[in-house]
Amino acid sequence: MSQSYNPFYNIENPQLMGYEYAWSSFMRGQGLNNAIISQEIGQSWERCRNGRIQMNFKGNTSNTPGEAPNTQETFLKQTGGKMIADILEAWDNDCFYGIITDAHGKKLFGMSNTHRNFSKKLEKVGEIEDFSEGCAGTNCFSLVSETCRPFATAGAQHYFECFHGLAGYAAPIFSANYQMIGMVGFYTIAERMDEYILSFAVAVERAIENSL
């Protein structure tokens, strides 16, 4: 936690400010506030702290030398990527970053709908190549990977401060035999968080599954 940390910057949004207070208390060793932070997020915070996780934007994204192209990943990138592009075109007046990952959180596809005026808060999301908990701490993709169900994280529900101005929404993608093969989601700035975004992530997930 930075020395200049100030939880009052979200004073106009009590929900986000509550997350900030819970996070700052946890980071100071004052325990978890279970009235504000869910069990899944609290457990993820504890794993990050106990494992001394450091933010790793690049992650471990390289394939094994000589490894054949993963047709499943190619399918997710092409099919899911096109669906995300279509949605972001419809959201042209807003600020979103759409993402497809593998089942572990490695980014396969990423796209913003605000190329001409890309939000400074979203720039860091575009740089992340691996959303697994071990590389990016607590985030919507790491929690989907852990729980195998749609998840949203907003503001200081994330473990790392670079996410605190953002809200993320992600859903799992399952194969025909019910194995999770990837994840799809969207990030926006926290002030524009809304549960309808999670419904879009679920809709894309189901459309991808129907294309398998």
Question: Where do the language-model regions lie?
Answer:
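Extended hydrophobic
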Residues: T153-A190
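Acidic, low-complexity proline/glycine/alanine-rich linker and hinge segments
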Residues: E67, T138-N139
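A gly/proline- and charged-residue-enriched helix-loop-helix capping module
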Residues: S132, G137-T138
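Short Pro/Gly-enriched beta-strand edge/turn motifs at strand-loop
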Residues: G81-K82, F151-G155
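A generic local secondary-structure boundary/capping motif
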Residues: I87-L88, F141-S142, Q157
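Intrinsically disordered, low-complexity terminal regulatory regions
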Residues: M1-G126, V184, A190-L212
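Short solvent-exposed loop/turn micro-motifs enriched in small/polar/acidic residues
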Residues: W91-N93, G137, H164-L166
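Soluble sensory domains of the PAS superfamily and closely related sensory modules
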Residues: N139-F151
